[in-house]
């Protein structure tokens, strides 16, 4: 009588394990931290056009921003990583925008001389793209 119960328990466990594995591996991007909302998104949009970011990137809401060199910035706020390696948070994004070569030497993204305040506003705009 104990054997059928053990077999039932083993069968149930074997059915549940794959579901747990899939659930554990599912990755949803964490929401950007509250400090990422600092800055002025409206000004950030203007700066993105001014610095010519759309020459390399496709950026929603920015006129003539259909570049295909860099990755599209669609749904940027929902991403887990910046440049494929940095956790997506406001500090990392501001550092990346201001001086990408200091963050990842040899990256294709050029250093455009973006000031700290401009980087903050550009980051604020990008975080609206979620």
For each feature predicted by the language model, list its residue ranges.
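Extracytoplasmic electron-transfer domains, predominantly the class I c-type cytochrome c fold
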Residues: 46, 64-130
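Short, structured helix-loop boundary elements
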Residues: 7, 38-41, 70, 90
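Short, non-ligating residues that shape and space the ligands of small metal-coordination modules
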Residues: 31, 62-63
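C-terminal motif of bacterial Sec signal peptides marking the signal peptidase cleavage site
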Residues: 21-24
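Helix-to-catalytic-loop junction in kinase catalytic cores
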Residues: 57
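Electrostatic cytochrome c docking/interface patches
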Residues: 26-49
């Amino acid at each position: 009588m104990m054997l059928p119960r053990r077999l039932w328990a083993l069968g149930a466990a074997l059915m549940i394990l794959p579901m747990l594995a899939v659930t554990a591996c599912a990755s949803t991007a964490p929401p950007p931290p509250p400090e990422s909302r600092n800055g002025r998104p409206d000004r950030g949009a203007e700066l993105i056009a001014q610095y010519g970011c759309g020459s390399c990137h496709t950026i929603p809401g920015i006129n003539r921003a259909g570049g295909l060199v860099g990755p599209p910035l669609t749904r940027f706020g929902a991403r887990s990583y910046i440049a494929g390696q940095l956790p997506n948070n406001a500090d990392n994004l501001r550092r990346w925008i201001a001086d990408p070569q200091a963050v990842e030497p040899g990256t294709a993204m050029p250093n455009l001389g973006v000031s700290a305040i401009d980087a903050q506003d550009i980051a604020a705009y990008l975080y609206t793209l979620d």
